[in-house]
Amino acid sequence: MKKQAVSFMLCAVIAMVITPVALNVKSAKAEGQGCYKSFYSEDYNSGTKIAGENEFEHFPIASMCKIMTLLLCFEEISEGRLTLDEKICASENASGMGGSQVFLEAGADYSASDLIKSICVASANDSCVAMAERIAGGEEAFVQSMNERAAALGMENTVFINCTGLPGAGQYSCAADVARMLRELMKHEEYFAFSKIWTDKIVHPEGRETEMANTNKMIRAYSGCDAGKTGFTNDAGFCLAASAMRGNMRVISVVIGADSSKTRFDRTREAFDYAFANYTNKIIFEKGIPLDERCPVQGGKISNVSVKAKDDVCIFTSRNDHDEIFYELEFDRIKAPVKEGDAVGKAFIYKNNIQVAETILLSNENVKKISYFDSLRKAAEYWIL
């Protein structure tokens, strides 16, 4: 009871002293809608901050640590060192993990796909350790890789001591860092095959089944939400990192230390609603769509070539702003022959005269090199004229 009273007093103090950024969260707390320790939201494409409170403060994040565990799993797959159908033997150490689990059988083989699915859906600690042992030979070495990857991503306010998020001294992160690692995880398209699962089961080798239900209730409760990770321990409180997409705009929201599960989901819903209502991504280039401009080609059967953007380019902006957005093209000195898909230059995008993005320009067609006889024919046509 004493701990509950202290927590309540801390929430009240936080509610009084935090100045909201962009969102009127102070009034929401005053109306008894719950409190939390930290919050952050951003645009996925640009990484631009939308709102935040204590987003760089150090807090335990419970099972949101598994975002980094999953990131290393999918990077292992991308590098070709792991396949989803590979069979992985669950050690006695892995099967004995406490907390959230799917009750792996020691000595039994499970597919990497099932283990990853159980991490995404059921936040399975035993599956995390099984994957850590497969990838790095042990959890300790795997945690070292987690910290190295965090450093490479610029996560300056994060330290991992395990791959599960179970309580431990010296393990912490911050809302902005959690958003950064979720953003990195979502670059792996395979992840979404698991993150959107609502209910499923894992079948153990001897036929026993463990039912699973997604701990991220936003998957069903909020239109466009298709990714995220929950977390809870007594020290961390209720946590949630989630992402939702509508149209061409994707938003990431992170809540740490909420006083209830309802609060973390309500706060996330509020963050999504605010972002989609007040911001937009203006489309500058669509991947593969030809531009009006053409690139000059030397020594080709035609003198210029149609070009297209290598990537989609959208500029994050407030719906109420009247930003001046324009682009400039810089073509390379291109000589025939040219193949469709060859890089021929770059496009630089500016917002209010400040460069905010760039993309490579690709040839949209083939251009053959002019032959000697083509040259003679062109010269003859010139003299005839």
Predicted regions and their residues:
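Hydrophobic alpha-helical segments and their boundary regions
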Residues: 4, 9, 36, 88, ...
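Active-site-adjacent loops and short helices of periplasmic peptidoglycan-processing enzymes
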Residues: 20-189
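A general lysine-centric signal
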Residues: 2-3, 66
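Sec-dependent N-terminal signal peptides of Gram-positive bacterial secreted proteins and lipoproteins
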Residues: 4-26
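Hydrophobic alpha-helical membrane context
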Residues: 15-16, 78, 279
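Amphipathic, positively biased hydrophobic alpha-helical segments used for protein targeting
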Residues: 18, 58, 73-74, 80, ...
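Domain-terminus/edge residues, biased toward the C-terminal soluble/receptor-binding domains
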Residues: 155-156, 167-172, 176-385
